Amino acid sequence: MKNIKPLADRVLIKIKEAESKTISGLYIPENAKEKTNIGTVIAVGSNKEEITVKVGDTVLYEKYAGAAVKIENKEHLILKAKEIVAIIEE
């Protein structure tokens, strides 16, 4: 695995995969899936004063936030902490 450590006020997020079927059971083709803006925090930068999330948090982030990066064929984002709009509690 690549070891990516975000710098300063940045956060590395693993993007939650879009659902592959609807509530009624219909399968959604790959090209028709909506891109989600929910993910799990994988790593945080060193500027702890500006970062209010921690590793393992599920977060909602701005739709066009961050820079996309693939790690082990999974979609991730590196974005600024201020682009995270909410923590999702389950």
Curated annotation (Swiss-Prot):
Protein name, as recorded: Co-chaperonin GroES
Keyword Calcium annotated: no
PANTHER family, alphabetized: 10 KDA HEAT SHOCK PROTEIN, CO-CHAPERONIN GROES
Residues forming coiled coils: none
Assembly and interaction partners: Heptamer of 7 subunits arranged in a ring. Interacts with the chaperonin GroEL.
Role description: Together with the chaperonin GroEL, plays an essential role in assisting protein folding. The GroEL-GroES system forms a nano-cage that allows encapsulation of the non-native substrate proteins and provides a physical environment optimized to promote and accelerate protein folding. GroES binds to the apical surface of the GroEL ring, thereby capping the opening of the GroEL channel.
Annotated family: Belongs to the GroES chaperonin family.
SMART domains: Cpn10
Alphabetical list of NCBIfam families matching this protein: PRK00364.2-2, PRK00364.3-4
Keywords associated with the record: Chaperone, Cytoplasm
GO molecular function: ATP binding; metal ion binding; protein folding chaperone; protein-folding chaperone binding; unfolded protein binding
GO biological process: chaperone cofactor-dependent protein refolding
Organism of origin: Borreliella burgdorferi (strain ATCC 35210 / DSM 4680 / CIP 102532 / B31)
Keyword Chaperone applies: yes
PROSITE patterns from the UniProt entry: CHAPERONINS_CPN10 (PS00681)
